[in-house]
């Protein structure tokens, strides 16, 4: 039995290319073992706490090994509960559209919440930063309107580069990427792009969850 946490970053549901490819991955994951479980975190329907003064004060006190106030401790507990939910999975799947060469703001908000000292990373003067989410696979599906891979436009890709940097920072080493591009093209080409990405998702899920 395995638990997959699926983090959905597009609000477009079944109109989203990244979401549709993710569904092919999920179906294959569920076929691998009847006991497998999927938990979906729709970032457009999940209440994320504000990153406000109390939370920031708590964070910096923790970074400096100081005790937070009662209000700061409450804010930190709310954050810690979300991080605990995130870490309570065996593997991960993100579906992400490109917005303005980067990621949707809801996903950035979520990342700012889960990237926490003592919870998903640690720091020491001797060894520097060390990620704490280790030994788990993460698959990221990126949808983008233009062709970025293998073109001059690759320098504008702050979607995949940012996600891989962040995931590596908090400890992931087994990171897999599926790119759905270009989607802003004619209907026939768009369907070919989608079909190719779905097949790639199915093949990867079979490999990760021992269906081959």
Curated annotation (Swiss-Prot):
Entry's EC annotation: 1.6.5.-, 1.7.1.17
Catalytic activity: 2 a quinone + NADH + H(+) = 2 a 1,4-benzosemiquinone + NAD(+); N,N-dimethyl-1,4-phenylenediamine + anthranilate + 2 NAD(+) = 2-(4-dimethylaminophenyl)diazenylbenzoate + 2 NADH + 2 H(+)
Positions with a binding annotation for FMN: 10, 16-18, 98-101
Keywords noted in UniProt: Flavoprotein, FMN, NAD, Oxidoreductase
Cofactors, names only: FMN
Source species, domain of life: Bacteria
This protein's record includes keyword DNA-binding: no
Note describing how the cofactor binds: Binds 1 FMN per subunit.
An annotated Gene Ontology molecular function: FMN binding
Gene3D superfamilies: 3.40.50.360
UniProt family annotation: Belongs to the azoreductase type 1 family.
Quaternary state and interactors: Homodimer.
Free-text function comment from the UniProt entry: Quinone reductase that provides resistance to thiol-specific stress caused by electrophilic quinones. Also exhibits azoreductase activity. Catalyzes the reductive cleavage of the azo bond in aromatic azo compounds to the corresponding amines.
Cross-referenced HAMAP family: Azoreductase_type1
Protein name, UniProt field: FMN-dependent NADH:quinone oxidoreductase
Annotated gene: azoR
């Amino acid at each position: 039995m395995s638990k997959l946490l699926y983090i959905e970053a597009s609000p477009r549901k079944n109109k989203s290319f990244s979401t549709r490819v993710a569904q092919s991955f999920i179906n294959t994951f569920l076929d691998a073992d009847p006991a497998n479980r999927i938990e979906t975190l729709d970032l457009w329907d999940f209440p994320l706490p504000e990153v406000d003064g109390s939370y920031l004060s708590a964070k910096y006190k923790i970074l400096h090994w100081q005790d937070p106030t009662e209000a700061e401790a409450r804010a930190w507990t709310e954050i810690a509960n979300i991080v605990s939910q995130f870490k309570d999975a065996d593997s991960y799947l993100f579906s992400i559209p490109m917005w303005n060469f980067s990621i949707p703001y809801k996903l950035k908000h979520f990342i700012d919440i889960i990237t926490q000292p003592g919870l998903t990373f640690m720091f020491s003067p001797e060894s520097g930063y060390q990620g704490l989410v280790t030994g788990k696979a993460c698959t990221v599906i990126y949808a983008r309107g233009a062709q970025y891979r293998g073109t001059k436009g690759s320098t504008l890709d702050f979607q995949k580069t940012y996600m891989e940097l962040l995931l590596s920072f908090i400890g992931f080493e087994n990171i897999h990427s599926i790119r759905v591009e270009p989607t802003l093209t004619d209907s026939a080409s768009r369907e070919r792009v989608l079909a190719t990405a779905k097949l790639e998702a199915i093949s990867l899920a079979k490999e990760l969850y021992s269906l081959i």
